[in-house]
Amino acid sequence: MSLSQQLKQINEKSASVALDRKSRSKLHSKSLIFAPKVAATQDYDYLHSVGVDGLTELCTIDSRFLKFQQTLFADSTVNFDRNVQTKEIVDNLDASIAAFLNLVSPFYPLSPAVKAVEWLVRRFYINIHNSEALILTCLPHYQSQIFARVMNVIPKSSWPPIFNWLNGYRDMSKNPPSSSILKAFRNDYQLFKLYSEYITQQVSVETVYKEQLVFYLTNTIQLLASYSTDIEKLNEVYLPVILEVIGKFLLASNTSLDHDIKIAAYTLMSVVVSLVPLADDVHISLTRSILQVPGAFDPQLKRQTMIILAQTWQRYTGAKFDFEFFNTIPLDSLLKDNLLESLVHEGFDFNNFLLALISSTNDKRTLSLAKLFKIERANEAVATTFISRLIDAASFKPDTEARASIVAAFEAMLAGSRDTLVEYLGSKKEPMSLADLEMVLLTTLSSSDVDDSEINVAQSDEVQEANGSSNSEPVTLDGVKSHTKSFLFQCEDFNDLSRLLVSFLAPFESNSYANQIAKFCAAVFTGPNASITFTLRCSLTPIIPLKVRLACLICLKRKLKELAKSGDTKLHLILPILILGLYDDHQSIRAGFAESIHSLSTPSASKNASIFLEDEMYADVAASNKVLISPKDGDSLINLLTSTDSLLKETVLDKTRLVSVLFEVVFKAQQPSKKFGLVCQTFFIAQWSQLPFAAVFKSLIFKIMSGRNITAECPSRESFIKGDVAGLFSGYEAWMASAQESKLDFESDIVSPLVNLVGGQDELSTPNSSEIDEVGWLIKATDFTKCPVIQVAATKRVTQVFEFLKPEDKVRLYSKFIELQASDDELNFDAQEILQAMPLDFNSALTLLKNFQLVAQIPEQQIPKRRRRSSNSSKQTMAHEELVSIASVHLRKLTIVLDLLEYNLRKNLKEIKPELLSSFFGILTDLEYLGHDGDMPVLYTQEVLATCMLLAVKHIKAINENGSGRISIDSNSVRADLIVNTIRSSNSPQIQNRLLLVIAELASLAPEIILHSVMPIFTFMGAHTIRQDDEFSSFALQDTIAKVVPALAKSGASSFSNEIEFLLTSFVTAFQHIPRHRRVKLFSSLSKTLGAGNSIHTILFLSGVQYASLFGKGKHGDCLSLLEFTQGYMKQFQASEQLSAIHKFCTLWQLVPTKPLDPDSDEFRNLNSRPIFGASILSLNDTELVELKAGLITFIDSLLQTDEESVGYLQLRVNQLLLDSHSTDGEKTIIIDGCKNVASLLLGSLDNFGQVSKMTKVSDNLYQFLDDILSLLPLVYFLDSIIDVLKNPMGVDRVAINFARLAGNKIENELTASNLDEQIQFSLFEKLVPVLISGIKSNQDAEISQAYMDATAQAVAKLGNCTTCFNEAKNVSVLNECLSILTSESGLKSSKPECIISSMNCISSIINIMGVKAIGFFPKIFEPTVEIWKTTKTNEEDMQLVQTSVLLLFAQLVKKLPAFVTSKLDSIFTCTIGSLAVDATVRSSILSSIVEYVDTAYVLKALCNVWGEISKSDNAEVIGLYLGAMEKTIDQLEKKSAISQATLFIKWMIKAFEFRSSVSKSSQDFDTNTIHRLESSFHSCGLRYVMKLNDKTFRPLFAGLVRWAVNGEGSTSDTDEVSRYIAFFRFFNKVQEQLKSIITSYYSYLIDPVSSLLKRIDTMEDSINLKRMVFNSLTSSFKYDQDDFWSQPSRFESICGPLLQQIPTIENSIGKYLVKCVSAFVVNVSSEEHNEKLVHGLIHYISNEHSTTNSHTKTWTIRILKSVFQKMGDQWLSYLPTLIPYIAELLEDDDEDVELEVRKGLVKVLENVLGEPLDRYLN
């Protein structure tokens, strides 16, 4: 084991060991449940109780958790520490933890599981020691929150490397997506292998769960799919693992998830075999594994097993298909439920599997599955092999069942692909044709359609010997003898003889079949009669191979020719049988029978010739019932058929022509006698119907007769109805057996033709004593459950003959099928489909409805009630079980009838009468009783009835509108009250909606009936329908209103308006219950139906009342919802309609009283009669009425108000219409008049409310509403509408004030250079501005003057910005006049602050336009403004507004008149900086403007001038603004100006440096930080200014500063020396940092003062701070000295001594600054002479020889030496011998601190410089 591995093991074992409190707390804070801070404080007792609680709950879910109560969750584990346990105990612990995690894995999303795992995390640190198992068990829950928690509790040091791909999600505390899981599985084989092994282990220990299986399946399937393009890697790497998993899954015996595990295995196997081309032995191995799965063929798994077997064998490419393991398949289970058949039908390919199964097993039952082989899907090798296996099976004389299975298989192949089968048969080693195959199978293939070209049968009449035979063993006829005389009838031995014949012929070639048949007949039969009838029957029997049938036909023809030639026999009796052969499906058979008919002619027959087969055929027929024709007529009949070749040729080519030949030619022949045809028909029909022919003959007879019956009248069918049809019910089993023996299709060959004989194009017979009830027979047939085939055929026949039935028979059939549909019996046909196929006429419909109507008399119409109450007696009566059953059946039948009626009403019901409606209402009453009294489920029936009523009413309307007739509706036919009652009582919205649609349709058809119930309808719609959130309800509601309201209006009812108001009130009342997304559409369509003029204002008023109520209750969300709806609703209408509605709204608003009304007053009665007012408004008190009126105005005004970002919809429409050149004058007039009408009404209301104090809120809202109404108009129209009001304001005219403000706002917001035209300019300058100026001059009222001034300012500003009109002299004169007024008592000199503020605002706007043209007014403006500013200090009420206005005016003056304000800058600065009520950012901006626009030299001078006053301020913000302005001024100042103003600036700087001193002596209360910030600004100003000066200018100024600092020269205050030095060095140090070496020489002015200062500094106050600054100053000078300034001896001597003399007195707090200073000095003056002096100077302070030496001096001197040696290095090594004795002495100093300083500091540095220990030198 490597060292790294050993270290890793040690780390893992000690990962949960915490050696200090901090790490222990961090380790303990990892929790799945608690926050880290909470978890860190929890003890193990509490955590154990949490875990036990979780485990207890888990035990109730799964008892397997019980075993952990005594292990992991035992009480003793509270004190368990895994870090001190033995390896064996730890291993057992890990095993228990793994077992628990496996078991708890499915329950991770549950709280108990998290609690239990929490204990394991906190006590056993499974997040550290079992982190891999923890992640593995939790991985299927990667999308849940628990997975993120699990990742979070695992420390990075313990994170399993195999899960490093999760680190990113762990750090972000996010769940990984499924794509990341898949990517990890795909890119990391080891991870996939690990999880595969883990899940197989889970399966083996029975802890796997569904989610885990789904997780593994999902990712594995996607993994396989991703490698579909890299099969090689998939086979090498992943496939072995997956196959191993499949194998273990298949063998799993998990009791709970056995089925799911096997399904998972099947799924994986399915994907594998679909994607990967496996070797054949793998397919075989997989199959063997599947068949060994326990329970693979159990019912719940059998389907999946067969599917996977099919998929596995679908890819098998081997040649071997015989495997023993297929014998283990339980065939009984496989054949049960037709499973394979259904799977094949679903598209699964079982070809290879079927071949393997049939090849591997000897059980004949497997042959029954051969029919499922799909030859069209199979490859050639598989198909050929399969066909060969079947042929071999057929050749070994299989039993009947096996042969039938083989035949069924070939027939299925023929149906699937005939050409493919023929191709594969031809490709065999011994090629075969279909005819050969039929001979092998000893039967005819029903789908073979063998062509004549495939038949090689000798056609010669001469007897030929066989040319050869096949290798098959011939069949012997020894002992075979038949005594049957005729085979025309059903006989027992025919089937055996026919099979013997086919077997007898099998060894021979087909061209000798006829001769061999002759031999067979000669050997078996005793006479020609038997031979002829046998060959005849064989010729028409489908089960016999076609080759044999043709050969029999040849033999028959030979026999008939022989008899005809003999002349002793008349053959005409057999003619009807031979004619049947002309209806065979094969043309070759039909041709043979045609030739046989030609052979019947016996022209030389003797008169005494016998009639062939007469005795055999008619032996059981009484002589009186025999219907024969004479031999002569027989000859004539034969001659008729054979004389004209075309007759028989037609039937040979087309068998259907036989019907026409018989019924149109033969049966209507009039030669040799007129009744010859009738005689022939009688003969044929009698023989066909009387004689019990075999099924093969009867089938053809039925087909011929039914073919005639379907196409034309066929009275002769009656003979068959009495016989065969009547006996079908009793003899169907015999028919079925005969059909099966002959391979006839029982349905198509027997039943259908026979049933088609019932009924026809003539009326069906009615029951009487002599005739059969054909309708009754059909009814019985439809109910004949013993034979479903007869049922289905009868139902089809019913639909065919229905139109020829009598009305009463139609009703009988309707009733029968309704009964069948209503029954619970399983039917073999769709009764409803049959009912719909039988067209329903009006009379039948009416009869059916009456049959199912319970109440004979509809109850009388009464006053509508809320709901009909069910009586207890009725309920008790209906509670009987028998009655309930009867009622249920009745209801079911009634529903079927109504469904049928609905179908026919939609399709083809033409005639309709009011009686039908009457029946509907009777049924409606029935359903009410059944629903309420019987508690029956009548909802669907009611819905269908409502639909029928709706369709019927629509039909009647269509008839009336088409003019084809007029159907009148009266109260006997229509009962609106019943509809209303049903609507009210029903709980189904669908029924309610449909009945509302019925009401809608009846409204125009019978308005006088419906309108009596209109109020309850409206009430119901408002209370219920309007709340439904579906399209149908919405449509029903709108359609009802759309049709009822016009009818209501057309009726001319006086209460129309009240009813409309009632409707709208009910709708708006339910507003909150209407689905939000349907509100606008509903009410807009409602308004369009009612008419905009009749409804919009009412809806607005009712909405406003709701808004006021909601607002008063504080439901602002509902208020907002109501406003949103109303805005969307109003957008649906034209602008003129909206304005008209607003006007009408205001009219309604005026009707709302302001105080309660007297109930006896007319006004009260009038309002109370109107639904929109009513008691809800009239019952309010004074305060509530005022609130209502105010709320209504607020509501309507909210619809008009806009914001800065958008324009109101109505305003947009109004502007669009008025400004559009295409709009007509009439349209514009309507809009303008609409606004004026509303404005006039509001002005009138203002006159009423303006003087009433309690109506102030109402009047305020009215003013705002009036403003918003006028705002709708474009600017030009608006100005024209308000000019008159502005001209003559009366007193405090709120209207004029609002109009002026509104005008200003509209000008500000709407006027732009692009839309300013001459018309607007004229209105503004020629109309508005003069009126405003005149109003200001009149000085009537402060508020009016203020509004006029503001409007003037806005108008002038906009005009000045958008036009150049003020360049004209006449317009300038207007502004001059305005300025004159504004600077008079009406403006600046006014005593009213509001007028002063507005006047300054207006002056600013005018100056902005006029510029220097306003210079004449400058004195009139500036001085009063300054005086106004001064007054603000005494009048604090309006201080902020006035000061702001003053500053803004100053800013405008500075911008437009910069040259003229220079003399006033002092005042401007004082006012600006001193306006404390104005925000500092505003003042700063104005100061910046002054600096920008005015010459900076004047600005600097003014700033210096005002400093004296500014410095006295106790507001730091004021001084900060001043200094900010100073900095900006200096930045803008040119160098030339800076030099010229330098002396002034230095004087200002000296004053600024003295600021700290003056503050300390004054009452100014500044904290130290504030003073530091201000001084920093002083220094910043000084530095900025110095940077603009040259040396020539700055040097004398600097000398002056030095003199000020040293002597106080130029001081304006009695500042002490220390303060001056401190202020000076603060500034000078910053200058040094900026100018560096440039200013080093300036120290010549400071050497003597500094030297002197250092010598006496210890005696000064605040010496420490000053010392630090001096040291820093000297350090900077030494550091930046590049010209050996300090190396000059005099300078060195001046500073060296005073500097070293600071060592004894240096304070510890600033000692480091002295060290830096001295070391920098040494570095700077480095020369032998200077160094020698410095060394001895420093030795002085470490040598014990001097009395001044002490531990303090030694310590700081040592530190200086240390720093010097660090910087000088080798340069000072020459002085080491001088210093060594003193160092040695210091190392033995009595003061340990000194010794330590030397040993750890100086000695270390010296050794570093020397590169060797210092001990050698010390010794």
Swiss-Prot record:
InterPro entries: ARM-like (IPR011989), ARM-type_fold (IPR016024), BP28_C_dom (IPR012954), HEAT_type_2 (IPR021133), HEAT_Utp10/HEAT1 (IPR056473), U3snoRNP10_N (IPR022125), UTP10 (IPR040191). HEAT repeats lie at residues 1779-1817. Keywords: Nucleus, Ribonucleoprotein, Ribosome biogenesis, rRNA processing. Involved in nucleolar processing of pre-18S ribosomal RNA. Involved in ribosome biosynthesis. Its main location: nucleus. The keyword rRNA processing applies. Belongs to the HEATR1/UTP10 family. GO terms for biological process: endonucleolytic cleavage in 5'-ETS of tricistronic rRNA transcript (SSU-rRNA, 5.8S rRNA, LSU-rRNA); endonucleolytic cleavage in ITS1 to separate SSU-rRNA from 5.8S rRNA and LSU-rRNA from tricistronic rRNA transcript (SSU-rRNA, 5.8S rRNA, LSU-rRNA); endonucleolytic cleavage to generate mature 5'-end of SSU-rRNA from (SSU-rRNA, 5.8S rRNA, LSU-rRNA); positive regulation of transcription by RNA polymerase I. Component of the ribosomal small subunit (SSU) processome. Transmembrane segments: none annotated. One of its GO terms (molecular function) is U3 snoRNA binding. GO terms for cellular component: 90S preribosome; preribosome, small subunit precursor; rDNA heterochromatin; small-subunit processome; t-UTP complex. This is U3 small nucleolar RNA-associated protein 10. It is found in: Nucleus, Nucleolus. It comes from the Eukaryota.
